[in-house]
């Protein structure tokens, strides 16, 4: 025990000594604290603080033990039990005190020594630290002071520089101002001299003016004297003229008295003739008279207005106007007319045509609707001619009323205006017999009517039967000789027989004009003939012809003389006439709808209209007494005009009173072709007989129509186009063919004005005066040009008519043609060489007239039509080559030809100072103004007499056009520079794109120009990155500066204006407009920042990948160094990697590093050794002994999918992940030497894989790289194609985005949908290797107007790329689970029949479902292109009863054919039948699958009711010709895809059907044979959707698995399985049970994607 205690004791005492020794050594070791830095002092302080804390802990521990040690030391020696103390005691007693050291030293002394030493050290450290801190503070204060002094020094230096600059500017300004002031002083001195010189000149002029003024005063005094003398002479002449007027009035009074005497003689003669015996006419008809009452409206104007036509209704007001028809008895107080004459009252021409203003806008030739009234004190008789208009006549007339005839009935509105033209209004007495179908008919007319209508007692057009009593001759004794009367009878009979023979069997049209007048618009006007003096007495009618032999009798008979009675002109307008002992008042002429004066006895009693008879007329010609037989057709109606000229009716005034139905040739404005060219629409027979289309209104009058003298007849025949009558008259001798009426209208003028080309040709052949002008100076050429009768114009020009003749108002034929928009006439006149610069009295030129109408074609002809080189021989080829396209297509003619009109003509001002541009701008004719502006000599700043420019009077549209008049349209293009190299998938990426055209005006400033460029770029970026088709106008309201792809105005690197560089905000001394013109800048090019600048903006614009994503990719490469991009083939992986490498290279070079890009293409033969050599040669792998270089290396490995990643990169994974010398890797070179290498930290490795997903051993590599997946259904690939194609369309349309309904947009959207639907279907099929990136679709052609080009391109893409990939993918999947003997390669080379069938089915489904669906081409065009697609129509053959081990007898079943062509029609469905093959026990035990019979209807008809459709079947017998489970899975997926609601319904593509064909398999087991006759399917409401084309059901039993495919008529495709539920197995149900019709359908299947190994065999669950 003592030994243990002794061995322990020295240990306790040695520890304090060691501690004290260590402390002493530390104290002895001196070091200089002053040499330590601040950080070292802080570290020392922290160490010492830690040491002090440790020592404090030791002290505390020692204090705890002190008490125990003290007691032990003091009292331990007395403890006899302790052997240790005993030894100590012996030791102390054995030697001297000085030589002995206590065995156990007192710890307190040791502790106190330690504490004292620590305190000393602490005090010393504190002092040194305080000194160091004070020195540090002092140093920092000095540094702050120094910085403050430096800043102050800089400020003072900057202020000094500013002051110097300011002083320099002030000095320069002072120098400049001195120069300017000195120059101004010199200018002022010069001006002062000029002003003094002008002052002297003005003084001289003032003196001269004063002298001239005094001379003018003298001359004015002399002229006043002369005027006084002339006034006295005028007074003398006035007195003389008054005396002469008095004499004339006396003479007129004498003549009136003589007229009264003549009237009395006429009455006596009539009494004598009435007393003579006549034919069997009832006696009382002698006493019936109809008076013609004239009601004047101004002055002494009188009009004798009568009508002998049927009733006319006014459909506009639905008010029936009856003219005054009054039977009167002979009376001495009032003059009477011949028996059964008819009278009608019309106060004025305005009352005859109230409120009709159809042609007022036609200018000179087609004037206002107010007719010209005759001068006062002129007696006028309205000639009895039809006056037709396009609206019904407001004035109506009634048929004559014999005493024994039924009262007339008003005509219903539904009959008269059948052809938008009322029956004619006749305005003259008919001094002849009454109308046919009434008693008192002229026998000659009745004879003609007999041939025309058959029996007089036959029902008329409305079924009314009127009796015709024997007519009598109502003519008095004739003064003509019998020979003349005999000749007249013969000629009239022949003419009537010619006229009536073609019309014998045809019923006449009730109350309607002939078809020839349909569509014509004759203006309204007056129909009058002026009388001079006494009315002439007619020579009477020809003698009658017996009724039994109509038209053949030659027996003469004395005719009746016919007298015209003019009512005295002094009668007032409100005079009443006493008729039949009843006074009928004439209402005032101011009534708006005309006067309605009706005899109470003659009111209509029936509602059925009274229709006129068949036409038959007499033509009486004057003085020679020879009656000419012809039929004169009438198109009568005056032509009102606001200005004089071409507004008077032809032959409206005549010196003769002509008792005839054909009053004159009216001024007609024909519009329809038939009225312009009557011969074109009439039959040859009608034309030969003289019948003109406008004859019917005349012939409907119902009474005879005798004519007057030959000159008047000539004019009438020419005006009415009666070639027969005209030729007969021209063959007579002594006829003046140039005779003109009072208005100056000749026969040639009338024919030309009415467009009767044949009559014009006859008159010109007869040498009529071609340039004879009327009283207003209008020639026949003027009339024809104004009316648009271009054939007449051409004929007149051929006969050398004066084409530059100017009327009294200065109107030339060219001016009139332009005024009335007659393009053909303008063209003919210009080709004839007419003068385009002739001006009217108002200062108007033809250009003014053309612009005033707003007719662009007329203006283009005037400005650009050139005179042919060969004069009038202007053939069609020259016209086609020299005359431009009036429609103004893309090839603008004015861009090819220069205007032929001079600038003076364009800028000519009329009387008000208005140019043609003023007129076009004020009326808003923008097209005309644009044509004028294209003339280089136009002066838009010319002012009118009110000091207004064209811009001042223009409408808003025209103001905008004028503001852009001289604007430069310069295309703005975006350039991305060179895209290199082309093998990176950048073939289809365009380098330049036109985004818009900038309008640069004269007033455009550089600030406006900068804003326009920035806004155009922003709008373009937003438009191409939007979801829909936006135009640039649609995005201007969007204020966002950044587009979806991240580009903005800040992405610009530089801008060039032509070849001059420019930056946004920069200004030149010239304005943008002047700058562009001077430098001839044809385009503005914007260059985007690219990889050369370390940016990716140009890459974003070229590839349409958003900038944010590209920047993120670059960040990943810089951060991880190892990045692989993978996605479907064609996802632009190579392009992205190369552009990222370029950008990274330039960034590193900008930072001062050298950088190199190394590219390697990997193929199947690329080995690991080759990759090692690549890494070593590029200094990416560095030997451990070698020091690294500062060079940066970028390695690109392309097409990594062609080799095994795990084999190729396995040895490099670890050193790539840990790049340092601490983790080297040993590699063996090709020469057998091995060495340690490590990867350089400055090496970047990027790779590309054209594969949608990794599989198998390649997944081992995945964790060692950073992967970027480019999915087709996610950004950036999802929207890349849409953005790219939209940009291509915008570029094709020169920056203008078309509307969404444009065919180009539709075909582009179709191409986009094809890519999306194709990938969607391929993903559902579980063939990701067949997915396509957007690269293949970037080359989609955009050809406006040629959508078939895109379809042809799609067919080539389908046949060359898509179909082979799909075929390979389907075969690859179908052969994965083959038996060992059938490998994948063998399956691809020699596919089985089942695999071929599946491939063909897949191709057909994809084609119809993804490609052809949605094609915007019409069905007919699409049918033509369908055959170009591979797999569009195929027979799918399925072998029945196939066994997996070997073939049984059931394998000889027939092949089923399913034609998926959507183009064939088929009939009804045949009832599908089910057949079970004869299956051996072994076949049932093995894995079995039913035979797949595609009983298909290839119909894509429209949606029908599902309950009424017969279902289609999918027969799956015990073994399919498919060789594996995956083939069956593919079939099921194809079926499911056909019925998927998420996919497009191919039923929308076509509308055809195929006959359902059924092939029975060789089944011998009758028990397993089942026939389902009425297979129906209960479908929920959700199933009836346009996208769900198939629904299926599945059933299984204990024996075999049978698939029942129940489909709608909509689809011909295989039936899906994913949407059905399996029926529970029912052993009680036999296979022949018909209960399989009870089917449930699962609509909730959300399954859309299939994996490769997902579906197992159908019967595995039964095992």
From Swiss-Prot:
Residues 119-276 form a coiled coil. InterPro entries: Ankyrin_rpt, Ankyrin_rpt-contain_sf, Cortactin-Actin_Reg, Cortactin-binding_p2_N. It comes from the Eukaryota. The modification Asymmetric dimethylarginine is found at residue 498. It is found in: Cytoplasm, Cell cortex; Cell projection, Dendritic spine. One of its GO terms (cellular component) is dendritic spine. Residues 1645-1663 have a biased composition (Basic and acidic residues). Residues 411-422, 583-597, 1582-1599 have a biased composition (Polar residues). Residues 1-23, 203-222, 358-440, 454-479, 498-616, 1447-1477, 1581-1602, 1618-1663 are annotated as: Disordered. The modification Phosphoserine is found at residue 1524. The keyword Phosphoprotein applies. Its main location: cytoplasm. GO terms for molecular function: protein phosphatase 2A binding. ANK repeats lie at residues 709-739, 743-772, 776-805, 809-838, 842-871, 912-942. Keywords: ANK repeat, Cell projection, Coiled coil, Cytoplasm, Methylation, Phosphoprotein, Repeat, Synapse. Residues 386-396, 1624-1638 have a biased composition (Low complexity). The keyword Phosphoprotein applies. Regulates the dendritic spine distribution of CTTN/cortactin in hippocampal neurons, and thus controls dendritic spinogenesis and dendritic spine maintenance. Associates with the striatin-interacting phosphatase and kinase (STRIPAK) core complex to regulate dendritic spine distribution of the STRIPAK complex in hippocampal neurons. Interacts with CTTN/cortactin SH3 domain. Interacts with STRN, STRN4/zinedin and MOB4/phocein; this interactions mediate the association with the STRIPAK core complex and may regulate dendritic spine distribution of the STRIPAK complex in hippocampal neurons. Activation of glutamate receptors weakens the interaction with STRN and STRN4. This is Cortactin-binding protein 2. It comes from Papio anubis (Olive baboon). The lineage of its organism: Eukaryota, Metazoa, Chordata, Craniata, Vertebrata. The gene is CTTNBP2.
């Amino acid at each position: 025990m003592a030994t243990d205690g002794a061995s322990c004791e020295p240990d306790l005492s040695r520890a304090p000594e060691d501690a004290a020794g260590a402390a002493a050594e530390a104290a002895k070791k001196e070091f200089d604290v002053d040499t330590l830095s601040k950080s070292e002092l802080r570290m020392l302080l922290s160490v010492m603080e830690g040491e002090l804390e440790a020592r404090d802990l030791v002290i505390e521990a020692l204090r705890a033990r002190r008490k125990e040690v003290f007691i032990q030391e003091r009292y331990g020696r007395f403890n006899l039990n302790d052997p240790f103390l005993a030894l100590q005691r012996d030791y102390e007693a054995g030697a001297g005190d000085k030589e002995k050291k206590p065995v156990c030293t007192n710890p307190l002394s040791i502790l106190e020594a330690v504490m004292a030493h620590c305190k000393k050290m602490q005090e010393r450290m504190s002092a040194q630290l305080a000194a160091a801190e004070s020195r540090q503070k002092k140093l920092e204060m000095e540094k702050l002071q120094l910085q403050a002094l430096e800043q102050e020094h800089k400020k003072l230096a900057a202020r000094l520089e500013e002051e110097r600059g300011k002083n320099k500017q002030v000095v320069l300004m002072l120098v400049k101002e001195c120069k300017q002031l000195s120059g101004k002083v010199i200018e002022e001195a010069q001006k002062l001299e000029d002003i003094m010189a002008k002052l002297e000149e003005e003084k001289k002029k003032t003196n001269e003016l004063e002298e001239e003024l005094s001379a003018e005063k003298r001359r004015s005094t002399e002229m006043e004297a002369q005027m006084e003398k002339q006034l006295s002479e005028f007074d003398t002449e006035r007195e003389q003229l008054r005396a002469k007027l008095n004499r004339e009035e006396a003479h007129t009074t004498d003549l009136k008295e003589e007229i009264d005497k003549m009237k009395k003689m006429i009455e006596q003669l009539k009494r004598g003739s009435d007393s003579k015996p006549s034919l069997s006419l009832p006696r009382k008809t002698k006493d019936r008279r109809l008076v013609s009452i004239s009601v004047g409206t101004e002055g002494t104007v009188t009009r004798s207005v009568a009508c002998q036509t049927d009733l006319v209704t006014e459909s506009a007001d639905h008010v029936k106007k009856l003219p005054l028809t009054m039977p009167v008895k002979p009376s001495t107080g009032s003059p009477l007319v011949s028996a059964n004459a008819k009278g009608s009252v019309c106060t004025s021409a305005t009352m005859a045509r109230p409120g009709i203003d159809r042609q007022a806008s036609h200018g000179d030739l087609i004037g206002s609707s107010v007719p010209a009234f005759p001068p006062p004190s002129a007696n006028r008789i309205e000639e009895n001619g039809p006056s037709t208009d396009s609206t019904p006549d407001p004035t109506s007339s009634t048929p004559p009323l014999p005493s024994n005839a039924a009262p007339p009935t008003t005509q219903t509105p539904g009959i008269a205006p059948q052809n938008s033209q009322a029956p004619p209004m006749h305005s003259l007495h008919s001094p002849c017999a009454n109308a046919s179908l009434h008693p008192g008919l002229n026998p000659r007319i009745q004879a003609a009517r007999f041939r025309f209508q058959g029996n007089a007692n036959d029902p008329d057009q409305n079924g009314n039967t009127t009796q015709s009593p024997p007519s009598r001759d109502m003519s008095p004794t004739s003064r003509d000789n019998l020979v003349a009367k005999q000749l007249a009878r013969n000629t009239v009979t022949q003419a009537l027989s010619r006229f009536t023979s073609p019309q014998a069997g045809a019923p006449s049209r009730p109350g309607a004009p002939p078809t020839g007048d349909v569509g014509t618009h004759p203006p309204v006007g007056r129909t009058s003939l002026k009388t001079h003096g006494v009315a002439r007495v007619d020579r009477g009618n020809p003698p009658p012809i017996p009724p039994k032999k109509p038209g053949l009798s030659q027996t003469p008979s004395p005719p009746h003389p016919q007298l015209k009675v003019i009512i005295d002109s002094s009668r007032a307008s409100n005079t009443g006439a006493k008729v039949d002992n009843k006074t009928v008042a004439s209402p005032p002429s101011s009534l708006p709808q005309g006067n309605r004066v009706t005899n109470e006895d003659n009111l209509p009693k029936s509602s059925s209209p009274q229709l006129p008879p068949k036409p038959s007329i007499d033509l009486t010609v004057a003085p020679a007494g020879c009656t000419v037989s012809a039929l004169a057709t009438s198109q009568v109606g005056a032509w009102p005009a606001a200005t004089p000229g071409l507004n008077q009716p032809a032959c409206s005034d005549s010196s003769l009173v002509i008792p005839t139905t054909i009053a004159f040739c009216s001024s007609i404005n024909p519009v329809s072709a038939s009225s312009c060219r009557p011969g074109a629409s009439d039959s040859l027979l009608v034309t030969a007989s003289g019948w003109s289309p406008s004859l019917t209104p005349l012939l409907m009058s119902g009474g005879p129509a005798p004519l007057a003298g030959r000159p008047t007849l000539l004019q009438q025949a020419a005006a009415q186009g009666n070639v027969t009558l005209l030729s007969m008259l021209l063959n007579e001798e002594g006829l003046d063919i140039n005779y003109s009426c009072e208005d100056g209208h000749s026969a040639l003028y009338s024919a030309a004005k009415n467009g009767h080309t044949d009559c014009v040709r006859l008159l010109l052949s007869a040498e009529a005066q071609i340039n004879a002008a009327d009283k207003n100076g209008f020639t026949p050429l003027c009339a024809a040009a104004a009316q648009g009768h271009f054939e007449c114009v051409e004929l007149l020009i051929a006969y050398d008519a004066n084409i530059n003749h100017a009327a009294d108002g200065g109107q030339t034929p060219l001016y009139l043609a332009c005024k009335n928009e007659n393009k053909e006439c303008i063209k003919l006149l210009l080709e004839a060489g007419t003068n385009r610069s002739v001006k009217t009295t108002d200062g108007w030129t033809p250009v003014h007239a053309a612009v005033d109408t707003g007719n662009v074609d007329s203006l283009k002809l005037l400005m650009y039509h050139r005179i042919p080189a060969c004069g009038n021989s202007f053939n069609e080829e020259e016209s086609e080559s020299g005359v431009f396209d009036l429609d103004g297509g893309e090839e603008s003619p004015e861009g090819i030809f220069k205007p032929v009109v001079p600038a003076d003509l364009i800028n000519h001002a009329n009387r008000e100072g208005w140019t043609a541009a003023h007129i076009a701008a004020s009326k808003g004719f923008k097209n005309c103004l644009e044509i004028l502006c294209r003339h280089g000599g136009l002066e838009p700043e010319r002012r009118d007499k009110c000091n207004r420019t064209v811009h001042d009077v223009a409408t808003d549209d025209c103001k905008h056009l004028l503001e852009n008049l001289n604007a430069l349209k310069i295309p703005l293009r975006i350039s991305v520079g060179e895209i290199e190299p082309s093998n990176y998938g950048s073939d289809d990426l365009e380098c330049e794109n036109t985004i818009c055209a900038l309008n640069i005006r004269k007033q455009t400033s550089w600030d406006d120009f900068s804003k326009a460029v920035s806004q155009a770029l922003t709008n373009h970026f937003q438009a191409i990155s939007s979801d829909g088709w936006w135009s640039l106008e649609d995005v201007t309201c969007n204020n966002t500066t950044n587009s979806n792809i991240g580009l903005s105005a800040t992405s610009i690197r530089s801008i060039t204006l032509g070849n001059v560089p420019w930056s946004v905000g920069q200004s030149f001394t010239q304005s943008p407009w002047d700058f562009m013109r001077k430098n001839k800048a044809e385009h503005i090019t914007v260059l985007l920042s690219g990889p050369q600048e370390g940016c990716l903006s140009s890459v974003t614009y070229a590839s349409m990948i958003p900038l944010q994503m590209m920047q993120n990719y670059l960040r990943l490469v810089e951060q991880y160094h190892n990045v692989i991009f993978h996605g479907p083939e064609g996802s632009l992986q190579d392009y992205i990697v190369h552009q990222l490498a370029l950008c990274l290279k330039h960034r590193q070079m900008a930072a001062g590093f050298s950088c190199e890009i190394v590219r390697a293409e990997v193929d199947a033969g690329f080995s690991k050794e080759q990759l090692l050599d690549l890494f070593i040669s590029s200094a990416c792998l560095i030997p451990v002994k070698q020091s690294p270089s500062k060079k940066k290396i970028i390695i690109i490995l392309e097409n990594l999918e062609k080799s095994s990643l795990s084999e190729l990169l396995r040895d490099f994974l670890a050193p790539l992940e840990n790049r340092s010398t601490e983790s080297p890797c040993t590699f063996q070179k090709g020469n057998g030497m091995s060495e340690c290498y490590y990867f350089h930290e400055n090496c970047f490795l990027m790779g590309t894989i054209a594969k949608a997903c990794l599989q198998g051993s390649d997944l081992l590599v995945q964790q060692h790289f950073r992967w970027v997946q480019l999915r087709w259904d996610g950004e950036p690939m999802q929207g890349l194609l849409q953005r790219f194609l939209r940009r291509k369309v915008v570029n094709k349309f020169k920056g203008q985005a078309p509307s969404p309904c444009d065919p180009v947009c539709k075909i582009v959207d179709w191409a986009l949908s094809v890519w999306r639907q194709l990938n969607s279907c391929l993903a559902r099929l579980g063939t990701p290797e067949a997915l396509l990136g957007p690269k293949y679709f970037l080359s989609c052609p955009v050809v406006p107007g040629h959508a078939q080009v895109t379809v042809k391109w799609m067919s080539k893409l389908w046949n060359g790329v898509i179909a082979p990939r799909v075929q390979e993918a389907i075969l690859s999947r179908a052969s994965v689970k083959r038996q060992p003997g059938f490998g994948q390669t063998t399956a691809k080379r020699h596919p089985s029949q089942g695999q071929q069938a599946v491939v063909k089915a897949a191709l057909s489904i994809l084609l119809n479902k993804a490609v052809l669906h949605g094609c915007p081409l019409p069905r007919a065009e699409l049918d033509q292109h369908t055959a170009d697609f591979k797999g569009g129509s195929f027979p799918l053959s399925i072998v029945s009863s196939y066994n997996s081990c070997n073939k049984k007898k059931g394998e000889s079943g027939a092949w089923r054919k399913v034609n998926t062509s959507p183009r064939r029609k088929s009939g009804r469905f045949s009832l599908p039948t089910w057949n079970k093959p004869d299956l051996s026990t072994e076949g049932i035990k093995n894995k079995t699958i039913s035979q797949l019979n595609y009983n298909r209807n290839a119909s894509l008809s429209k949606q029908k009711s599902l309950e009424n459709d017969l279902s289609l079947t999918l027969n799956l017998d015990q073994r399919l010709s498919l060789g594996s489970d995956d083939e069956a899975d593919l079939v099921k997926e194809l079926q499911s895809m056909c019925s998927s609601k998420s996919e497009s319904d191919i039923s929308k593509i076509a509308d055809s059907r195929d006959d359902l064909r059924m092939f029975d398999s060789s089944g011998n087991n009758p028990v397993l044979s089942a026939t389902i006759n009425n297979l129906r399917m209960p479908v929920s409401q959700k199933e009836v959707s346009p996208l769900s084309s198939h629904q299926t059901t599945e059933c299984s039993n204990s024996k075999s698995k049978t698939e029942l495919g129940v489909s709608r008529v909509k689809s011909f495709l295989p039936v899906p399985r994913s949407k059905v539920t399996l029926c529970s197995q029912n052993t009680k149900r036999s296979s022949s049970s018909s209960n399989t019709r009870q089917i449930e359908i699962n609509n909730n299947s959300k399954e859309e994607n299939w994996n490769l190994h997902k579906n197992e065999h159908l019967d595995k669950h039964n095992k």
